[in-house]
Amino acid sequence: MAGWAGAELSVLNPLRALWLLLAAAFLLALLLQLAPARLLPSCALFQDLIRYGKTKQSGSRRPAVCRAFDVPKRYFSHFYVVSVLWNGSLLWFLSQSLFLGAPFPSWLWALLRTLGVTQFQALGMESKASRIQGKKLALSTFLVLVFLWVHSLRRLFECFYVSVFSNTAIHVVQYCFGLVYYVLVGLTVLSQVPMNDKNVYALGKNLLLQARWFHILGMMMFFWSSAHQYKCHVILSNLRRNKKGVVIHCQHRIPFGDWFEYVSSANYLAELMIYISMAVTFGLHNVTWWLVVTYVFFSQALSAFFNHRFYKSTFVSYPKHRKAFLPFLF
């Protein structure tokens, strides 16, 4: 197996190690919540760091020192502002390199190398088959970065014009992590493009001719999942509006419709499906991106678990057939 293709399966670089560590941390947090109550950590800070919004309020009484580090949950919009600007810039650099042959900026190239990217190989040493594979991967990277930017832009729109935020809070550590998260995700996507020095492996003159079934399927899954997530957010928003669309309260109600008929956190399920659609776009065998998906799975599952417990403890009439995150399973 040649060059970067072989390295794809064998190297645990700093980027992969980071995603693996994040996934393991959220898996551990989830397992602790599923364990018997006597085994749960009593540390208020631990509980404060893994909860946000309504689930933070529904837990045990929080010490004043924890409340001092609260920031409004509506600051979620800041995450998407950062993502639109940062990942839009990365998309611009990638487009310039793919279609015009412009090299990446020195700082970006150095950052990718620091993260331990394995996609660097001298072009002259690659076979024709490897060059074709490189073009497919370049197209996958371009499409996934477009998906990430479109996703962030839609979520930013929803934060401003759809969502109705209550006065709940997130911890300042969660806020800082959210700001860094989309920067890291964008770099993870960009790191998958094959490069020779500061130039992208495959120029984009005939890039679209490299489209394969997984590119098309991934695109279809992305828009399908995004449409469901948007619908779920509209459903949640309408719980706090009257028929004219005017916000009348910020209380919590039981959501019905779309994937909410199956799970309590349908929007989190849609988020997972969006990331899986990106894994499909990468051809289903990109180890690095599957580590990202694994992190998303456990982080969303943890939040969904808290949501589900909140709904069940708050509403006596809550549908008993609903699961927390995965239909019919969990």
Curated annotation (Swiss-Prot):
Membrane disposition: Multi-pass membrane protein
Which GO biological process categories is it annotated with? dolichol biosynthetic process; dolichol metabolic process; dolichol-linked oligosaccharide biosynthetic process; polyprenol catabolic process
A GO MF annotation of the entry reads:
polyprenal reductase activity
> EC number(s) in its UniProt entry?
1.3.1.94, 1.3.1.22
Q: In which pathway does it act?
A: Protein modification; protein glycosylation
User: Which residue intervals are topologically Cytoplasmic?
Assistant: 1-16, 111-136, 191-206, 299-330
Which tissues is this protein detected in according to the database?
A: Expressed in the 2 tissues tested i.e. testis and liver.
Arranged from A to Z, the UniProt key words for this protein are: Endoplasmic reticulum, Lipid metabolism, Membrane, NADP, Oxidoreductase, Transmembrane, Transmembrane helix
Listed GO CC annotations: endoplasmic reticulum; endoplasmic reticulum membrane
Q: Can you state which reaction this protein catalyses?
A: a di-trans,poly-cis-dolichal + NADP(+) = a di-trans,poly-cis-polyprenal + NADPH + H(+); a 3-oxo-5alpha-steroid + NADP(+) = a 3-oxo-Delta(4)-steroid + NADPH + H(+); androst-4-ene-3,17-dione + NADPH + H(+) = 5alpha-androstan-3,17-dione + NADP(+); 17beta-hydroxy-5alpha-androstan-3-one + NADP(+) = testosterone + NADPH + H(+)
Q: What is its main location?
A: endoplasmic reticulum
The record's annotation in InterPro entries points to: 3-oxo-5_a-steroid_4-DH_C (IPR001104), Dfg10/SRD5A3 (IPR039698)
Its EC top class is: oxidoreductase
Lumenal side: which ranges? 38-89, 158-169, 228-277
The record's Pfam families line, in alphabetical order, gives: Steroid_dh (PF02544)
List membrane-spanning regions: 17-37, 90-110, 137-157, 170-190, 207-227, 278-298
User: Subcellular localization, per the record?
Assistant: Endoplasmic reticulum membrane
Protein function: Plays a key role in early steps of protein N-linked glycosylation by being involved in the conversion of polyprenol into dolichol. Acts as a polyprenal reductase that mediates the reduction of polyprenal into dolichal in a NADP-dependent mechanism. Dolichols are required for the synthesis of dolichol-linked monosaccharides and the oligosaccharide precursor used for N-glycosylation. Also able to convert testosterone (T) into 5-alpha-dihydrotestosterone (DHT).
Sequence similarity: Belongs to the steroid 5-alpha reductase family. Polyprenal reductase subfamily.
PANTHER family in alphabetical order: DFG10 PROTEIN (PTHR14624), POLYPRENOL REDUCTASE (PTHR14624:SF0)
Protein name as it appears in the record: Polyprenal reductase
Give the organism the record lists: Rattus norvegicus
